Amino acid sequence: MSNLKNLTGPLSANNPVIVQILGICSALAVTVKMEPAFVMGLSVMVVTAFANLVMSLLRNGIPSRIRIIVQLVVIAALVIIVDQFLKAFVYDVSKQLSVYVGLIITNCIIMGRVEAYALGNKPWDSFLDGIGNGLGYAAILLIVAFFRELFGSGSLFGIQVIPDSWYIANGGFYSNVGIMLFPPMALIIVGAIIWVHRSFNKDLQEK
C-alpha cells in the first residue's frame, strides 16, 4: 500500500505542481507543444527517481553539513546524462528544450523530494516516490501543453487534428487562438487546473 501511495499520491492529492506549487517555471517554457512537454516530464521523472535512489543509498554516510553540495552534484550528474541522451537520440526535441534541460538541476521538485523523502526512507520507496512525483509533474505539463498546442496550433504532438476545412481561410469558421502560444497562457491554464482541482478536493481549500 505504501508503494502504491508513493506512485499515485503525487498524481492528484499531493501533486508537486498544483498542490505544492513547485516547478511552475517549466510550465511556461516547454508547454507550447506536447512533444517537448512529454520529453521534459520524462526527463524530470528519471532525474527525480534516480536522485532519490542515490541519495537514499548514501544518506547514512553523508555529513549533514555537506549534504546540499552532494545532492547538487548527484542531480547535476544525472541531468548531464539525460541531456546527452536526448542530444543523441531525440536531437530535434533537445534543440526545442534548449537550456531548459540543464535547468532541471534547479527544479525545486527534485531537491524537495530528496530533502523531504529520500534522506529519511529506504532506497526502493524513495525511487518510487521519485517516479510518482515525476509522473505528477509530467501530467500537468501535458495537460497544459494539450490546450496550448490544440487551440494555438490546431495540432497534437505535431499532428494536425483540426481539419483544414474548418479554418476561415478555407471558408470555415475556426482560427487558431494565437494568444495560447504566449507564456502567460501557461500560468493561466495552470491556475485554472489548480482552481478545478481544489474545487473537487475540499481538504486543500483554505479555511
Regions found by a protein language model. Give the residues of each.
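C-terminal ends of transmembrane helices
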Residues: 51-64, 111-121, 198
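Structural signature of hydrophobic alpha-helical transmembrane segments
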Residues: 34-50, 70, 94-105
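Hydrophobic core segments of alpha-helical transmembrane domains in multi-pass membrane transport
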Residues: 24-28, 44-49, 76-83, 105-109, ...
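Cytoplasmic-side transmembrane-helix entry/capping segments in multi-pass membrane proteins
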Residues: 62-75, 96-102, 129
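Short, membrane-exposed interhelical loops at transmembrane-helix boundaries
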Residues: 157-179
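Short amphipathic alpha-helical coupling elements at transmembrane boundaries
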Residues: 6-9, 56-60, 125-133
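Hydrophobic alpha-helical membrane-insertion segments
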Residues: 130-152
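Transmembrane alpha-helix boundary signature
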Residues: 81-96
